[in-house]
C-alpha cells in the first residue's frame, strides 16, 4: 500500500472517527437502583422520543432521528453536549423503569407521555427535552440535502421557503 493510501486509510478509520460514528449506537446501561435492568442505545430511544414529541413528523415525511447521526459527527458539537444527550437517554429510561418497571421504548404512548411530564418538572429533564426538540426543529427546517426534511415537507408545513443560495453539498 502506498503512503498516500495508507494515510487516507488511517484518517478514515481512526479510533476517534470510529468513536464519533458509534456515539448514538453505543450501549447505555439502564439501572434499577443497584441492579442492571437492561441496555438500550441513544438512537433507539431518540427514534421513539421524536415520535412522542413531534407526532406529525412521520406524517410530514420529516425523519429527525437519523439527522442526529450527522450532527453528532460534527466537530462543533461539544463532547459535553453529546454526553448530556446520552445521559438524558439513560435518565429518561431510568425514570420509565422507576415509574413503570419498563424501559421508555417499551411503554405505551400514554405511559411515555407520563414519563415526559414527570421529567419535564426536573431541571435536567426540561433541558433534555429542550435540546432534543431543538435538534428536531433543526432537522425539520434544515435543507433537504441533509436527508431529514424530505421533499421540503417541514418548509411546506410552515409555508416557508428555504434560504438562497441552497447548498450544493452537505456541510456536515
Predicted regions and their residues:
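Short, charged low-complexity linear motifs
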Residues: 1-4, 141-142
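N-terminal secretory signal peptides and thylakoid transit peptides that target proteins
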Residues: 3-32
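Conserved aromatic-histidine-acidic binding/catalytic patches
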Residues: 10, 37, 80
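Onset of an N-terminal alpha helix
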Residues: 12-15, 39-46
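Bacterial Sec-dependent signal peptides at the C-terminal "C-region" and cleavage site
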Residues: 30-40
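Mature-region segments of soluble proteins
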Residues: 44-51, 60-63, 67-172
Amino acid at each position: 500500500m502506498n503512503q498516500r493510501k495508507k494515510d487516507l486509510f488511517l484518517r478514515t478509520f481512526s479510533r476517534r472517527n470510529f468513536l464519533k460514528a458509534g456515539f448514538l449506537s453505543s450501549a447505555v446501561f439502564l439501572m434499577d437502583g443497584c441492579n442492571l435492568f437492561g441496555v438500550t442505545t441513544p438512537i433507539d430511544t431518540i427514534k421513539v422520543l421524536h415520535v412522542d414529541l413531534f407526532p406529525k413528523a412521520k406524517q410530514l415525511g420529516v425523519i429527525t432521528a437519523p439527522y442526529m447521526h450527522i450532527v453528532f459527527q460534527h466537530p462543533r458539537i461539544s463532547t459535553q453536549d453529546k454526553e448530556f444527550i446520552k445521559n438524558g437517554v439513560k435518565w429518561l429510561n431510568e425514570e420509565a423503569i422507576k415509574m413503570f418497571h419498563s424501559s421508555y421504548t417499551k411503554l405505551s404512548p400514554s405511559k411515555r407521555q407520563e414519563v415526559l411530564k414527570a421529567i419535564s418538572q426536573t431541571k435536567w429533564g426540561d433541558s433534555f427535552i429542550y435540546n432534543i426538540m431543538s435538534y428536531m426543529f433543526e432537522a425539520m427546517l434544515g435543507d433537504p440535502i441533509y436527508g431529514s426534511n424530505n421533499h421540503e415537507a417541514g418548509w411546506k408545513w410552515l409555508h416557508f421557503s428555504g434560504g438562497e443560495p441552497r447548498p450544493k453539498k452537505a456541510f456536515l
